[in-house]
Amino acid sequence: MTASSRAPQASGSSDSERSPFVRLNELLGPHQPGKPLITLAVGEPQHPVPDFVGPVLAKHTADFGRYPMNQGTEPFRKAASAWLSSRFKLPRPLDPASELLVLNGSREGLFLAAITAARYVSPRPGKPAILMPNPFYPVYGAGARAAACEPVYLPTTVENGFLPDLDAIDEATLARTVAFYLASPANPQGSVAKPDYFKRLKQLADRYGFVILSDECYSEIYTREAPGSALECAGPDFTRVVAFQSLSKRSNLPGLRVGFAAGDKKFIGMFLELRNIAAPQVPVPLQHVATVAYGDEAHVEENRRLYRIKFDLADQIIGNRYGYRRPDGGFCVWLNTSELGDDVSITLRLFKEAGVRVVPGSYLARLQPDGFNPGAGYIRLALVQDGETTAQALHRLVETLG
């Protein structure tokens, strides 16, 4: 049985409930880096903050003195909707008043969306389930558990192009599915779903009545073809499709904590009801910055140029080692180091000998029922440092691992 045909079933262990970065700190904490530390572990962009951020904040500091509306300011919603229409081939423009909602970054939105999805769908037979790729962004699993749903992990491997195999999901699982988390570009592998994939997933959502939660936060980091959106294949009413965006990666603003959800009108309305009670509002001055950010592409193009340089360096320095492939999107490199040892040992070795901090792939994934961990044997590198530092880290990695 190939990895891509393994049954997608709910599973987990005690460690699976914990942050991979807490586990990484515990692994590396007792040790000292062998060389001056370079961290490629956390996906925190280190490129410069756009020049307009300071002046816009200064202009709107008085707005810190009032409570924001949870829906978001009208200028922000209009700017985000206009950006979506210009960036993607949508069936029609989204209504900024009813089909788009500001978020404190995408993470809290992705978490609360699971709770909304459980209310959005009709009753399920048996235990309601939320499907997600494996490896995956940990908030997906946390959201599923908070919604009293069973997280179902769909292995993403080299055999299935690092995207969930939609044809491997059994009908009983689909019948009890509440939501399907999809990341495109994927974290950590950088794979991108094509239109046919989105269309097939939408067909399943329509047939079984679940909602697609499309995490598209890496969509603006690419070096070749621009990734598409699930909204492009959602139909004129965007029914059962909600896309999530963020300025953290696109605009080098992880500290701004501004993103949005857009799509299905009914879902967005229910989402707003929940967030009016359970979620903190986004400060108005930060929404002013985000409004300007979504109206400017020059800084995004410069951002892509800098990442392109670093992926060119990875092409040259890593070459054909460790199953390296230039990702279709995002800024992560997913290396297969299984022939050199297990991923946890490799991570510790790189830290102790090379002073390079990476993430073991097994920490980003969960065990399938048969004991298979799709992240085992891999390490993830986030190419977020400047070009010179990135080159130094990659040279150290190759020199250490051979």
Model-based region annotation:
Residues 24, 40, 57, 80, ...:
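Generic structural signal for small/hydrophobic residues in well-ordered secondary structure
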Residues 128, 207-210, 238-239:
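A short helix->loop->beta-strand "cap" motif at the edges of active sites that frequently abuts
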